[in-house]
């Protein structure tokens, strides 16, 4: 059986006025279901770029110049944007360092969780709301049945990051890409 995630000879480039900057060159890895892979490196080594490339969120002008990314054997680095969006929500969850980039300030966290759940899972809004409350509880949000109707700005940084983690888990993805998910949390919460 193919691995859950297979990355082969990934090369990420940025065109500049002075020529091409190769930011990541020849990254390969394979992740089996249930396996955890930690990527360690100096600041600027390309860890975040690699994660962004895997989930199809590489900021232009950055581009995958070579290599391939496969999810359960299916090539995903060449998918059109709309198709990749479906993969990102349903099959791959993402947790970033800054929770404010992952949450829409105009919608309650409940609205965002329910939308993610109903978009990717065959579930009614009321069932999705129950699941959203369970997710908030499982990530350590106190009084989730009340906090579900709060807006992102009404949560502390640490609590916002827990909401982002709940959002990443909402559609029951096969794979989660987490880029320093606990940076915004204090040390006692990081340990949890």
For the regions a language model picked out, list residue spans one by one:
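Conserved ABC ATPase "signature" region
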Residues: 75, 127-146
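A short, proline-enriched helix->beta-strand linker immediately N-terminal to the Walker B motif
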Residues: 170-174, 190
């Amino acid at each position: 059986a193919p691995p859950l995630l297979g990355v082969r000879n990934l090369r990420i480039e940025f065109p500049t006025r002075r020529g091409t900057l190769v930011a990541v060159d020849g990254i390969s890895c394979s992740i089996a279901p249930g396996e955890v892979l930690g990527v360690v490196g100096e600041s600027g080594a390309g860890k975040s770029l690699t994660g962004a490339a895997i989930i199809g969120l590489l900021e232009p002008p950055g581009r995958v110049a070579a290599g391939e990314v496969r999810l359960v054997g299916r090539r995903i680095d060449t998918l059109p944007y709309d198709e990749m969006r479906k993969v990102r929500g349903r099959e791959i969850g993402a947790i970033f360092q800054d929770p404010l980039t992952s949450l829409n300030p105009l919608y309650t966290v409940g609205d965002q969780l329910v939308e993610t759940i109903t978009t990717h899972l065959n579930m009614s809004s009321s069932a999705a709301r129950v699941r959203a409350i369970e997710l908030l509880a499982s990530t350590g949000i106190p009084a989730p049945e009340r906090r579900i109707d709060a807006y992102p700005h009404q949560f502390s940084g640490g609590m916002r990051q827990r909401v982002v983690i709940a959002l990443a888990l909402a559609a029951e993805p096969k794979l989660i890409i987490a880029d320093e998910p606990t940076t915004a949390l204090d040390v006692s919460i990081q340990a949890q």
